[in-house]
Amino acid sequence: MLEQALKDGITLFQWREKGAGSLAGQAAEYEQFARDCLALCRQYGVPFLVNDDVALALKLDAEGVHIGQDDGDVAATRARIAHKILGVSAHSVEEVHSAEAAGADYVGLGPIYATVSKADANTPTGLVWLEEARAAFPSLPIVAIGGINLERAPAVFAAGADGIAVISAICRDPSFVAEFQQLAL
């Protein structure tokens, strides 16, 4: 599935191995799976970010890391990873401001719509929050996440997103990326 998405043109891959059926707790398998995904990303020239695991990102020499609000101090993470890509999940203007001030390269905002990918997801914000964040932070890259599909993607970009993050859409339909590329956004 990852290789097909890479062939179809994804521009960044965030490795997130959590939840039921994940390899979390199986250190050797967890790391090997990450290494395998990293190798594929490198083969296609696509940046590989590790979700929430700074130590693993550094061990693998990944291109970066994405952290949530409960995953550690943003400034400390920036210092630890130096020049690597740092993404931060944010759910309020204050969190976006803090992430930007601490050196985040981009923020992930959402869920924009209801999502089935994350059991503990916040209440969907809709496009209004995305529009407000774009107006308040015109130069900070914003990646929208949560319930985004082919039908919703154009409105998400029109509201100010620089990119979208998808899990379910690709898992349900491996041709999602190729179909997405056909949209005139």
Predicted segments, located by residue:
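Conserved N-terminal beta1-alpha1 strand-loop-helix module at the mouth
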Residues: 1-66, 71, 79-106, 122-125, ...
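Glycine/threonine-rich flexible loop motifs
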Residues: 117-119
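C-terminal structural segments of small proteins and small subunits
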Residues: 162-163
